[in-house]
Structure formats: C-alpha cells, structure tokens
Amino acid sequence: MSVIRTENLIYDFTVPDPEGEGEQKNRALYGLDLAVEPGEFIAILGRNGSGKSTLARHINALLTPTEGTVWIEGMDTSQEEKLWDIRTAAGMVFQNPDNQIVMTMVEEDVGFGPENIGVPAEDIWKRVTDALEKVGMTAYAKTAPHRLSGGQKQRVAIAGVLAMKPRCIVFDESTSMLDPRGREEVLSTVRELNRQEHITVLLITHHMEEAALADRLLVMDRGRLVMDGTPREIFTQREMLRQRGLSVPPVTALADALRDEGVPLAEGIFEEEELADALAAVCRKNGGRSR
C-alpha cells in the first residue's frame, strides 16, 4: 500500500476581488495524481507559486481537497475522525522552527505531541530520549530552545515529529532560513532518518543541491506535476527546467560548463565526489592535462 496517494487532487482558494466586489476563486492544484511508496526519499521542486506547499499541507491534512481524494496509509484526509491518525502517520517540519517549538525546555517540547495524544508518561520519556538521540540533540535535552542555533532548533522540531512515530515526514522548505552549517546539520539528519529508520521523506526545497540527495524528483509548475524521475533523469533536461524557472545543482552547472569547453565529461553529474572522480580520470587519461 502506498504511504501517500492522491487522485485528481484539485484545490481552490478565494481571495478578495481586486475591484472590491466580493471574492474571486483561484485554483492552486489541478488534478494531481501521485503515489509515494514506503521508504522513498522524494524532493519536490518548483518556482514560487507552483503549488509545492499547498500539496504538502494536503499530505498533513492541514488542507483538504476541493475535488479528488488524498489517502495517507489508506486513510481519506477528508474524514475528520481520522485527522489525528493521519497527522501521526505523516509528520511535518515547517520553514521556521520558532513557529513549531512551543515549550521552554527541549525535552518538554519533544514530548509535547505524544502527551497531547494521550501517550502514557513512561512511554513519552522513552520516545523523547529516542528522538533526541536520532537527531543528535541528547546533550541539549535540558536546554532552553532560544539558546540553540537555527540548525539545532530545526533538529529539535524534527525530534518533536519523530516522537509521534510517523511513517512519513514532509519537510516544507525546512532549511531555507538556515546558514550553510545549519542546512548541512538538518540534511544529514534527514538522510539518516530515511536510510537508517526507513522513514518516507518528502523534501520541498528550492536548493538544487538538496534535491540531488533524493531518490526521486517531482517538479511542479502552476499547480501541475510536470516532471517525475530520478535526479539524473531530471537534471539532464536543462531546457525543460529553465522553462519552469529552475536550474541544475551548482556542481552540475560546473560540469556542463567544462563539457562545453571540451572536457570529456558524462552528462548527469550532480555530486561533488562524482565530478572530482570524473576529472581525476580525465587527468590520468591525458597524462595530467585536463583536455
């Protein structure tokens, strides 16, 4: 069974009419059909206004479809009686960790969610301990969140989601407010959760180098799913990406520029190590010369 499945997902929203005459209806999602399998690591790309965050909020049942259906582990998100089960199965980490942290001590914040759904006290603290260990924040259990760096706060937010024992986590631009070190801390945690804990990950991002870490990429444009494939398949379609207001990872752009200058490199390079190995091979072949 798919962890996430959408069928003809349509979402409309209303905004004030610019002429001041009531409201007008806009469409954010146009008939999305999507299936996400257990353990997948998917990155969702798209320019501002493409519908990425709107889709994310449907997965966590913060929004429900105008038309069509969203199922999370077989549960229809339009069924209010299933709301807490859905939000337990599919956790969400938002852009600003300060909006997700509600308590004055790290361990209390991580235990807040399980306490709210009635988890017994002895089980709560086991969940808190396990979650903090998984994100590398055990040493900060007694620390006030305001004393943490941005990356540390985001890892606490992730721990709070983990304490709910989700099978899937949606990261909605969760690194966009962080410095490079904080981004790397969070991304390292995300990779480990997917590889070691087999948690399904949906990473919404505008950083191409983050998207390259995923197993599968989805590209959205104007409320539609327009591309679906592996990073190698997607990042070799430079013109298609450009038309959607997107680029390739910096390392891919560098490899492409070198290829255009005559360096014999394969297409579809999107990892630094891969480029370094390819350049080393070229140098060995040419006796130390790059061409």
What is each of the regions a protein language model found here?
Residues 144-148, 152:
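Conserved ABC ATPase signature
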Residues 60:
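Helix-to-loop junction immediately C-terminal to a conserved catalytic motif
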Residues 122-140:
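Conserved ABC ATPase "signature" region
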Residues 169-172:
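Catalytic Walker B motif of ABC-type/P-loop ATPase nucleotide-binding domains
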Residues 68-78, 86:
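Conserved ABC transporter NBD signature motif
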Residues 45-47:
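The feature captures the beta-strand-to-loop junction immediately N-terminal to the Walker
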